[in-house]
Amino acid sequence: MKFFALFIYRPVATILISLAITLCGILGFRLLPVAPLPQVDFPVIMVSASLPGASPETMASSVATPLERSLGRIAGVNEMTSSSSLGSTRIILEFNFDRDINGAARDVQAAINAAQSLLPSGMPSRPTYRKANPSDAPIMILTLTSDTYSQGELYDFASTQLAQTIAQIDGVGDVDVGGSSLPAVRVDLNPQALFNQGVSLDAVRTAISDANVRKPQGALEDSAHRWQVQTNDELKTAADYQPLIVHYQNGAAVRLGDVATVSDSVQDVRNAGMTNAKPAILLMIRKLPEANIIQTVDSIRARLPELQQTIPAAIDLQIAQDRSPTIRASLEEVEQTLVISVALVILVVFLFLRSGRATLIPAVAVPVSLIGTFAAMYLCGFSLNNLSLMALTIATGFVVDDAIVVLENISRHLEAGMKPLQAALQGSREVGFTVLSMSLSLVAVFLPLLLMGGLPGRLLREFAVTLSVAIGISLAVSLTLTPMMCGWLLKSGKPHQPTRNRGFGRLLVAVQGGYGKSLKWVLRHSRLTGLVVLGTIALSVWLYISIPKTFFPEQDTGVLMGGIQADQSISFQAMRGKLQDFMKIIREDPAVDNVTGFTGGSRVNSGMMFITLKPRDQRHETAQQVIDRLRKKLANEPGANLFLMAVQDIRVGGRQSNASYQYTLLSDDLSALREWEPKIRKALAALPELADVNSDQQDNGAEMDLVYDRDTMSRLGISVQDANNLLNNAFGQRQISTIYQPLNQYKVVMEVDPAYTQDVSALDKMFVINSEGKPIPLAYFAKWQPANAPLSVNHQGLSAASTISFNLPTGRSLSEASDAINRTMTQLGVPSSVRGSFAGTAQVFQQTMNAQVILILAAIATVYIVLGMLYESYVHPLTILSTLPSAGVGALLALEIFDAPFSLIALIGIMLLIGIVKKNAIMMVDFALEAQRTGNLAPEEAIFQACLLRFRPIMMTTLAALFGALPLVLSGGDGSELRQPLGITIVGGLVMSQLLTLYTTPVVYLFFDRLRLRFSRHSSQPVSE
């Protein structure tokens, strides 16, 4: 009593405390960063290494394996995958959440240094690493186009100046420049001219390398002066190299221009980038794992005007893609939903109380509680994101509950004629324990979420803490500010205030009367009601088992990613044409705003596209509907497939794939993996639960298999090294020298002119100069025949791996797909030497599925423990928890009706329902126990009176929570995919629970009371506490 009096009789102090909470919240709100979701990115580091011309198998065995053995010893590595293709190896290290990425980067560098001695000596540079996940969609894509500058010049400008500047911006993890390569002097050799002049390819390479030397020359010095020695030992341009003497034939000089075409070109001619089907250089910007996407994008945009000033007028720099507008629009939508929820909740209170003064009290309590939460969010390092703002939206119904319970009880005493201050003291004292029980038991629901590990735990932690803080502040406000405002604002009324019998009040009285009559009938037929309770338990279990499940709702972020996979023997020229054709088809779609893409490099038969859709208010279709429409249009393109997927704010794993979900096959026997992967992929592609099934195992690339006749080579004076150098010089785009410039270093690249390598007859023109100086054609000592070879070799850990990627058809869930895959693997009889497991998001889904039931049971057990401690009883918590099955039935039925799978967001809704619906039972049980103690009423009469007396606050709190969640169900626009499952779950659970628990709770209460009496030896008092 003294506690409540302290605040009721000191209104100024109470108001100032509330103002202080509000001001702190406003300050925290202004300082909070903005993000789509809580920070849940795994620390990922990518290691890259190159050896131009080396086959995928060579890269895997000589580069990837030594690096993997060294990197695999680093502590905290969650997963290590690698992919080796023509001349390139990429290793992805995914670390545990608790691993600091900067410390991990130091360990990665140390591991690379340790493996350096085991790597091939011909590598043009040491392996490098980047602190970014290559599988993440870029947060921004910039394009450079020009009518006067070449693609190589644009690439040089982008790589040397723009990428360097952007990479220094806080939050930027990686700037990947694509669409071409650095400028280079290309030496395209004429094999016929070389043969006629008797010049070997190795002699040309040596001559070029020896002619371009950057070495210190020292200085001259006398007693008074010092002169730096400078020579023309460097060659910079194609014009400098063209007159270079590479050989003497019969005393006549053979110059490089006589046997080759020398040009200022690019390092790798097999690269292409486009924007809207036009040539372009792309700057794909990815953020650091721990960086905030909105802050990073804002920082980049702030630097763009400065960068624009450094760009020549003939170069056009444009933002082709920016992921932040849809994120901002989504947050604006949820903020509007929050405001609507607050307004609806206040409206509910007004309809029940029909008093402006009374309505003002919760209208003040709710904003104070919600705004004050922002201060705690800032101190906890949280952000304003979809989940934290949804937590505040749902909290609207919670925080008003406490104020409603206190306000309604004080109003009841005022209507009975009690003076305001006395009613405030008496009313708050009566329900103080009830409000405390409701709040503590509600917070207890979220304790298991706080202890949950992995990505789901990280994802839900902000939601749980934000909601718990809001409830805690609401508890303090409802026990301090609310009683004070009631005591000073409200007036005493007559015992039977006529306003209760007008309009909505008359309807409420009629409903309450009808409820009383029906409750008497239910109490007389308690066995039937007991069967209903048992039925809801069984039905909720069955619905949970049968409902389709997924990890996270599919979001419409307004950005699509597309992976092109063409025939494995396709040429670069044909692949570039496919990219352009796909772009034209997509660009014609009315929902598409911009398309960018690139192809080439080490994977000639693949490409990547990024598609920006128009804003939601300018298109009528969702991202998935656009994908379905484009899939039909793109299906007729011969020789290539384009796999589209909507970019999500959550993507797990470092694998780059052409679909949203992955299933990985592992084996220590490479031949077994290559035998079974096509069978498994074909079987999975036939499943109706899967779409866009594809694999990263590509074993049918065209290869020309050369077999040396070593005896003949020995007789002719030719070594295997000579023959291999010939092939590398001719076909490997071999980097044979370096040109040093002030801002960058460029390469001299040598290969046979592509005009002579259009078919296998190019091998007939190749020759080696033997030890006697005679040209020996390759055909004299080697035979060749076409064969198949892998385009890439993939590892996970140290095992050979193949990842099958898939999307979900419209109307299918991830649980259905997972079950179908497991069933298919069993039916195929895959041997134990080939192991299958889900990867990435699908793997996290499997882990979450196993933890969901445990999490729900842990929440129920925690609530039981808290309630048992509060009531000092083993029985009463069971009565209160009996309300949960009906809520579960309602929630799961609502998801089924709306055709929404059970996701992590729906799980949050179930957890919230555990906290919400038990409030009704707490109010009933609390008043019934008090009536038995103080009024000496029988249990039947006590629970009956409790139900009638608490009918109005129960209806108010339930409707307030329901209307607080209703805007989530009805919301559209950006981000509605996240909000709707939460709203559907809560509204469905509340409706069903309200219909049943008003009747089942009294029956369960009486059942346990009779059970207690039957086993109790002390029956002198009606209730033993």
UniProtKB/Swiss-Prot annotation:
Gene Ontology cellular-component annotations: plasma membrane
Mark the transmembrane ranges.
15-35, 333-353, 360-380, 387-407, 431-451, 469-489, 528-548, 851-871, 875-895, 897-917, 953-973, 984-1004
Q: Tell me the domain of life.
A: Bacteria
Q: Localized where?
A: Cell inner membrane
Keywords assigned by UniProt, alphabetized: Cell inner membrane, Cell membrane, Membrane, Transmembrane, Transmembrane helix, Transport
Give one Pfam family, short name only: ACR_tran
Task: Spell out the molecular function terms from Gene Ontology.
Answer: xenobiotic transmembrane transporter activity
The UniProt entry, under PANTHER family, shows: MULTIDRUG RESISTANCE PROTEIN MDTC, PTHR32063
Q: Entry's NCBIfam families?
A: PRK10614.1 (NF007905), RND_permease_2 (NF033617)
The text of the family note is:
Belongs to the resistance-nodulation-cell division (RND) (TC 2.A.6) family. MdtC subfamily.
Q: How does it assemble?
A: Part of a tripartite efflux system composed of MdtA, MdtB and MdtC. MdtC forms a heteromultimer with MdtB.
Q: What is this protein called?
A: Multidrug resistance protein MdtC
Instruction: Please name the source species.
Output: Klebsiella pneumoniae (strain 342)
Taxonomy, top ranks, is:
Bacteria, Pseudomonadati, Pseudomonadota, Gammaproteobacteria, Enterobacterales
